[in-house]
Amino acid sequence: MTKSVMIVEDNELNMKLFRDLIEASGYETIRTRSGLEALDLAREHHPDLILMDIQLPEVSGLEVTKWLKDDEELRHIPVIAVTAFAMKGDEERIRQGGCEAYISKPISVPRFIETIKSYLGDA
């Protein structure tokens, strides 16, 4: 069974880039621009990994991550924060918010793919 990655990202160009890189690596994607939809989509599809933008329009990606980690059915799914926040202390704050890993924007393509594969293995 093909492993899947849910992408929660409101920027259309970032969404396309992440989708293309992930699908080219052999994984399926589930996509939403809305942090409010993320919980329902995760319950419906049970992705193997979630990529979470931290700066979403209606709700913080850290808040969505908290909802995921508070849900008995979903808390095992690793969440990788993808964010432009790259100041000292941001990674620690993001990890304390429940994210297992952190990728800063603009992304490094090799590091992005390496991080995804470190959680999912080869497709």
Swiss-Prot record:
Alphabetical keyword list? Cytoplasm, DNA-binding, Phosphoprotein, Transcription, Transcription regulation, Two-component regulatory system
Q: What job does this protein perform? A: Essential protein that is involved in the control of cell division, probably through the regulation of ctrA. Its phosphorylation status is regulated by PdhS.
Which Gene Ontology biological process is one annotated for this entry? phosphorelay signal transduction system
Please report the name of this protein according to its UniProt entry: Polar-differentiation response regulator DivK
Which residues are reported to carry the modification 4-aspartylphosphate?
53
Where does the protein end up?
Cytoplasm
Please describe what happens when the gene is knocked out: Lethal.
Highest rank taxon of the organism: Bacteria
Q: Name one GO molecular function term.
A: DNA binding
Q: Show the Pfam families listed in the entry.
A: Response_reg
Q: Which CDD domains match?
A: REC_DivK-like
The record's PANTHER family line, in alphabetical order, gives: RESPONSE REGULATORY DOMAIN-CONTAINING PROTEIN (PTHR44591:SF3), STRESS RESPONSE REGULATOR PROTEIN 1 (PTHR44591)
